[in-house]
Amino acid sequence: MRSQVIEYPMSLVRLAHELPIEAPRTAWLDSIIKGDCVSALERLPDHSVDVIFADPPYNLQLGGDLHRPDQSMVSAVDDHWDQFESFQAYDAFTRAWLLACRRVLKPNGTIWVIGSYHNIFRVGTQLQDLGFWLLNDIVWRKTNPMPNFRGRRFQNAHETLIWASREQKGKGYTFNYEAMKAANDDVQMRSDWLFPICTGSERLKDENGDKVHPTQKPEALLARIMMASSKPGDVILDPFFGSGTTGAVAKRLGRHFVGIEREQPYIDAATARINAVEPLGKAELTVMTGKRAEPRVAFTSVMEAGLLRPGTVLCDERRRFAAIVRADGTLTANGEAGSIHRIGARVQGFDACNGWTFWHFEENGVLKPIDALRKIIREQMAAAGA
């Protein structure tokens, strides 16, 4: 897929009640919809987003003020939107927004939900009950977590992310395995991620120097999520948009976004933040892919492109075995005909063989694998947008 330049609207904010039910894409794409998440999600069409990142209320169950040893008060989450009458009320709320998210998620889409020990297990239960299929749980290990000032529990140094596909048979979801492995020094990316909490210049502050949002997530966390599970041009939905981290990272990484938020101060902060983001260029956004993600090329395509002619003699890299290319795209050797893979296996006495890497052609006295010709075909397909 060719990268595209995304044009973002001058005004990001849309009012949920002014959008029609299942509004056209142009009415909500790259926008912040102001309103309750469930009612706002009704404005989006079925199967319209590729990835969802949700940072729902944690239902922290705080039993009073929390103080440091010097008696200064800890800034914790005590906003009205994080307060529920009971676990049953929280479960009903969770089920409602997850159902709404499931409707707008594409069949091959995935959802990420982040939470603490206060809520993530209840969210996980609802995800499974609604038919989502859990792919991974990711542990975000914080390099600079808040201490446990009362000394009555272990220091809470992580949060948990659940990554799930829309349904068990939801094949074709995006996972950029090779890119994640390459970014991790060619070692498989593990499910424990080490990031600092959001501090310093990245932390949004109001005119009084106070935090704009109590649970602002680090951009590095969202960047890894998007680089792992989406492609440039994909639509990322955040139903609890807050200070706009998802939108800012999506814009920088060439993804579309749609955020839902009901609190005007958060909307104002997110709008200013996103408008200040400069998207990366096409070259920087190219995602590394592996063999499985590359388009299939038939050996006959190499011949049809004139890169090999009937009668060409192929051999292995040590010139031990030889085969002749036939006009129908098969090879013949030792009186037997078949595909490049079958004949490669037969001449070696093996059960299987990758003919693309086994067979070589000669060019200017140098042997080259026919896989180099397949690469030329794939480059032509990419240039044509195939």
Swiss-Prot record:
It is an enzyme of class 2 (transferase). GO terms for cellular component: cytoplasm. This is DNA methyltransferase CcrM. Residues 280-382 form the RAMA domain. It comes from the Bacteria. CcrM-mediated methylation has important cellular functions. Contributes to the accurate cell-cycle control of DNA replication and cellular morphology. Belongs to the N(4)/N(6)-methyltransferase family. Gene3D superfamilies: Vaccinia Virus protein VP39. GO terms for molecular function: DNA binding; N-methyltransferase activity; site-specific DNA-methyltransferase (adenine-specific) activity. Transmembrane segments: none annotated. GO terms for biological process: DNA replication; methylation. Its EC number is 2.1.1.72. InterPro entries: DNA_methylase_N4/N6, DNA_methylase_N6_adenine_CS, RAMA, RM_Methyltransferase, SAM-dependent_MTases_sf. It comes from Brucella abortus (strain S19). It catalyses: a 2'-deoxyadenosine in DNA + S-adenosyl-L-methionine = an N(6)-methyl-2'-deoxyadenosine in DNA + S-adenosyl-L-homocysteine + H(+). PROSITE patterns: N6_MTASE (PS00092). Keywords: DNA replication, DNA-binding, Methyltransferase, S-adenosyl-L-methionine, Transferase. The gene is ccrM. Pfam families: N6_N4_Mtase (PF01555), RAMA (PF18755).
